[in-house]
Amino acid sequence: MKFTLSWLKDHLETDASLEEICARLTMIGLEVEDVDDKAAFKPFVIARVISAEQHPNADKLRVLMVDTGSGEPVQVVCGAPNARKGLVGAFAAPGTYVPGIGVTLSVGNIRGVESRGMMCSEKELEISDDHTGIIDLPEDAPLGTSYADYAGLDDPVIEINLTPNRPDCTSVHGIARDLAASGLGTLKTRPAPSFAVEGETPVKVRLDLGEDRHLCPGFALRLVRGVKNGPSPAWMRQRLTAIGLRPINALVDITNYLTFDQGRPLHVFDAAKVAGNLTVRRAREGEKVLALDTREYTLSPANVVIADEEGVESIGGIMGGEHSGCDENTTDVLIESALWDPMNIAKTGRTLGIITDARYRFERGVDPEYMAPGLERATELVLELCGGTAAKMDVVGYDGHEPRSVDFPVSEVRRLTGLEVSSEESVSILRKLGFGVEGSGERLTVTVPSWRPDIDGRADLVEEVMRIHGVDNIVAAPLASHNAVNGKILTTLQIRTRQARRALATRGMLEAVTWSFIPEGHAKLFGGGQPELKLANPIAADMSDMRPSLLPGLLAAAQRNADKGYGDVAIFEVSGTYEGDTPEAQRRVAGGVRRGTASLNGTGRLWSNAVKGGGKPVDVFDAKADAIAVLEACGVPMANVQFEAGGPAWYHPGRSGTIKLGPKIVLGAFGEFHPKTLDALDVSGPLAGFEIYIDAMPEPKKKATRTKPALELSPFQAVKRDFAFVVDKGVEAAAIVRAASGADRKLITAVNVFDVFEGASLGEGRKSVAIEVTIQPVERTLTDEDFEALTARIVANVAKSTGGVLRA
């Protein structure tokens, strides 16, 4: 939002300097982004060329004698094609800095002729890009005076960075209101427009929107006859130029001026070019309009237009049509002031790719109560600058604004901000901002003004009081220090999430972040696809469903790496999956995928390429080891964990497993992927993966503490004994491990399987499972008798649990 200092002072009575105004704007939340102060133009003066002779040594140069108003002519060498006797322009003396060329002038010698200054073009003064000739001013321009003063370039331009929730400050008047409320001056009030009206406006307006009346809640129209449309006055042209707008003609400039002055976008139609009455309606499919930017737009029923009997004349709230635009031949003009639905304006603007000052304001919300007064003010300016006779205003559809009231306890200011603001000051601030305030003491009833659609509740009112009172008045204070140990900062779920990440990274896996949205087919393949998990507005057709599992995204990521030459990858993710649309149906899961030879010691491990090209393909045991690593890192009691053969349908039925804690708690699953799953996802293997449900893990029995438990070490040497048991093929190795561990849980610290053998010598349907048992004495060195007794218990436990016998 741009405006000039003098423009602001049309609305604000203040003696504050430019620096004070900019500082206060930033303090009250209207951040000043840039200040363009043309004070550097002061040295440029208005001068007249009193003679122009051909340069003796150059065909394209002329030697000018220039009257700068000082009484003594100055010689200047100039190459501008329009340099001539009698021309009045802007002169720069030696020592003047010329911003357009970045040079400080000095007395020069050009092809043997001395030059003591420069006649400047608009580009050299950075007024425009025009450098075809030097500035050509009217003959009555006062010689010797500052060109900046004459051209209005002495007026600093302030640009503020508006947040979307402040539509009231898309006008100079709204900005002045905020400054006045902060104590920097007094807000000026303009008397209501007063002018004579004659007759009715013959062009009628019909709102043809059916049940979608919200698309155009109000429409006001007035005819002004007998106008003379020429250039707008210099003061208006200067202000529009200063903020980057191009003056066109008086009628158009008035609408642009009021857009910034009052935040009220308007539009003018040449009445002679409008066929019959106007209708506000949805555009028809494929309907076209040639807009004022000379571009043709193809419309759809999603767009709201203003049309006459022959077609579209304007894209409502965004841009008018070229056909009914006003030019120097316009004598009768229709002035329109309307209200438009912000959401529809935003969608139409994005769809058509049109950015205008009107769209900028309507999509944020304009003051509905200023629709008719804005038209009155525009009419007043048209009559003042263009003459003519105004007809009566015709208002259609507007039912008035229903003000909102907010119950406001004054103590909320202190509770939410820490500021001590008295009730009287809070009331004063709100009233200066235009709020209606009733009541006294602690509780107030505040009525929100029509120009503040962003105010919705108490917190918004607190913000208003805080920013006007001054954010810099908040006293910095350290947090209270209590001589006690801080409570637990992270939840158990957060701690376990961190532990899972570290454990998997330690195993050489790389963390990935995949989309939470996946194709519907992939979701159904992994147990999802429920209607409540479909996205209402997906960002892409293949991102339609919330994921029920991390594995589809990880498998796709692994395949993308393989397609680019990185086939041996090991990646993991710890994130959320979704079984329903309730908070309880969102799960925290640690999942991972290994591809190719990316086992723990394979090529997928970042710090070891020892077996590159000859590594063993990943299998179910790699995935199982990863899953166990997560469980151990999260503190799950592994002695109670059970592994069952078989997993979900997306795993290979004979090369997968399910991890349980008791009969009901499922901790996760792992395995190699089913060939049908890989085909459906269009990925190639070998691939193995796992998922661990972190939120299914039971809470630790011991209370969380920052203190690590004491490390208990035995002074006695650990002893390892090997056993080989012959069992039926259907017996799981885990059953043998559990049975051996149960022989003496105090002395036996680890049981590991190191060999499985099947052969004819063992008999039909039999196999040999070899285990290594680690025995750790605690209180004393064990005797041979102790080892023999423990060995007997191990053999007996395995025989009882599995029917296994020691292999001879």
From Swiss-Prot:
Entry binding sites for Mg(2+): D454, D460, E463, E464
Annotated transmembrane regions: none
Domain B5: 401-476
Domain FDX-ACB, chain residue ranges per copy: 714-807
Alphabetized CDD domains for the sequence: PheRS_beta_core, tRNA_bind_bactPheRS
Cofactor note: Binds 2 magnesium ions per tetramer.
Superkingdom, natural source: Bacteria
Cofactor(s) for this UniProt protein: Mg(2+)
Catalytic activity: tRNA(Phe) + L-phenylalanine + ATP = L-phenylalanyl-tRNA(Phe) + AMP + diphosphate + H(+)
PROSITE patterns for this protein: B5, FDX_ACB, TRBD
Gene Ontology process terms (BP): phenylalanyl-tRNA aminoacylation
Any one of the GO CC terms: phenylalanine-tRNA ligase complex
Entry EC number(s): 6.1.1.20
GO molecular function: ATP binding; magnesium ion binding; phenylalanine-tRNA ligase activity; tRNA binding
Keyword rRNA-binding: no
A Pfam cross-reference name: tRNA_bind
Keyword tags: Aminoacyl-tRNA synthetase, ATP-binding, Cytoplasm, Ligase, Magnesium, Metal-binding, Nucleotide-binding, Protein biosynthesis, RNA-binding, tRNA-binding
Compartments where located: Cytoplasm
Family annotation (InterPro entries): aa-tRNA-synth_II/BPL/LPL (IPR045864), B3/B4_tRNA-bd (IPR005146), DNA-bd_dom_put_sf (IPR009061), Fdx_antiC-bd (IPR005121), Fdx_antiC-bd_sf (IPR036690), NA-bd_OB-fold (IPR012340), Phe-tRNA-ligase_IIc_bsu (IPR045060), Phe-tRNA-ligase_IIc_bsu_bact (IPR004532)
Span of domain tRNA-binding: 38-148
Family from the record: Belongs to the phenylalanyl-tRNA synthetase beta subunit family. Type 1 subfamily.
Quaternary structure note: Tetramer of two alpha and two beta subunits.
Protein name (database record): Phenylalanine--tRNA ligase beta subunit
Organism: Rhizobium meliloti (strain 1021) (Ensifer meliloti)
